[in-house]
Amino acid sequence: MSERSVSKQDQEKRWYTVLAPEEFDRAELGETLAEEPDQVYDRTIQAALSDVRDGGDNNIKLTFQIDDVGSDSASTQFVQAELTRDYQRSLVRRGSSKVAVTVTVLTTDDYRVRIQPVAYTTKQADQSQQHAIRRTMIDLVEEAGEERTFEALLNSIIEGRLSSAIYDEANTIYPLRRVEVEKATLEAHPEEVHEEEETAVDFSGE
C-alpha cells in the first residue's frame, strides 16, 4: 500500500476520547481510532484504579467496555476489577494457606456480580479451618450484595472495605496475613436479569 493511500485512510479516521462510567466521574481513559462510530462499540480498555480515582490502588486493574459513542467521545461501562498478576504473586508465601471462593450476588438494583475473595493465612491452616474461613467469606459477600446497590458494592470492593470486613471476621477463625478481592466481574445488567427471569417463568408455565 502506498504512503499516499495510507495517509488518505488515516485522514478518514477519527479519534474518540474514551471516558469512564459515572461511578468513576467520567475520567478520561485514553483515545481510540475508528473510521465510523459503529466500529467503536464494544471495544475494551483497561486502566489502573489509580488512573481514574485519586488515591486509588495501583494494584487494581479495571476493564471497561464502550457502550455509547458521541461525535468525539465514547462512554463506557464497568466490566471487571482484578488484582494485577504481579501483586497476586507477591501475596503467596511458602508454608501458608490460600483460601479462595467464588460468589455470585444480585445487588439491590438487580446487577449480577461475580466476586472472588481470597484469604492468605499466616501459617498452614487445616481443612476445617479453611472450610470455616471459606464459609465466612461466602456469607459476608452474599450479605454485601443483598444490602447494596451495584455502585455501592463496587466501591466497597475497590476501596478495600469488603476485604477488611472479611479479614476482621475470618481472622478470629485462624490468623490471617491478608484478605483481598482477587476479581469482581459484572455478569449481567438489570434488563438482562429481568429477561432471564421472564424466560424462566415462561418455561415453568409450559
Swiss-Prot record:
Pfam family, one: Ribosomal_S3Ae
GO CC annotation: cytosol; ribonucleoprotein complex; ribosome
Annotated family: Belongs to the eukaryotic ribosomal protein eS1 family.
Gene Ontology molecular function, alphabetical: structural constituent of ribosome
NCBIfam families the record matches: PRK04057.1
Top-rank lineage group of the source organism: Archaea
Keywords from the named record: Ribonucleoprotein, Ribosomal protein
GO-annotated biological processes: translation
The protein's name: Small ribosomal subunit protein eS1
